[in-house]
């Protein structure tokens, strides 16, 4: 997976493919219909649940974490491989779909479990809890599924003319790897691992942040009311939110920034490795040391942020300078910084703004 690949010519080539071809503004624009259609399906599902199960007060309990997870996973799967397995709508329900749902849910479950051997490596041979065995089994099943997708895409390419407007990420990767030096790595392995890391990272980050954003708004009703008033003023009540509206939703942008500040999806970021001995703030750091940046602490530093533990989107409206989340301002780096900046930042922000705006506007 290129996210954990050391800096090298191979990493540079793979990063170039990911940033300039898979997650470029043009590619995201071509696949805009995927985001819009999945958002519409989810809103219809949510309304259907409400209309069937509402009580006398007109309220109904909904597990939004699962809804956000299914929504983002469907969007990412369609963009990566043209597949749709989760939620309602026209989701497949054949054997492949059921298998894929089971495997991906198991993957995300294992992704968050506490493994004793991570803290006490000498106990690894015991495999306490059976997690290592489960991870190996899940990894093998995931590889089989993605291998099937890859073979399916190859057959489709060989039997029809290419249509660039209908290409998903796997189609793009099949073309892109022909023209780059993979430094001895197998092309199929590179394509599969890249697609898998895009699915895993894209789904988890967006789903987690949407859950936190909604939770924060429900616990701060004044901010919720202000966001809905902005939506009524910008969008109105006669139509649904469009992506073209998002740039005009200033307060909504502040809500997303404040959510990313308080609850960054990767609270310790992506680990970095020192390639040479150096001195940082008076401390000697030897070559090979792994570095983790504590984003949780950085984003709640009282020297930088006033009332750092409070949810106050207004702080981003009243700052003397605009602070973005794209790695230009080191006090707020939820997506990382430098050449290891998350390549999916544009996609992530588009999804966060579109889903939250549509949800608040509709309900």
Curated annotation (Swiss-Prot):
This is Cytochrome P450 CYP82D47. It is an enzyme of class 1 (oxidoreductase). It comes from the Eukaryota. Its cofactor is heme. The lineage of its organism: Eukaryota, Viridiplantae, Streptophyta, Embryophyta, Tracheophyta. Heme binds at residue 342. Induction: Down-regulated by methyl jasmonate (MeJA). Belongs to the cytochrome P450 family. Keywords: Heme, Iron, Metal-binding, Monooxygenase, Oxidoreductase. It comes from Panax ginseng (Korean ginseng). InterPro entries: Cyt_P450 (IPR001128), Cyt_P450_CS (IPR017972), Cyt_P450_E_grp-I (IPR002401), Cyt_P450_sf (IPR036396), Plant_Cytochrome_P450_Monoox (IPR050651).
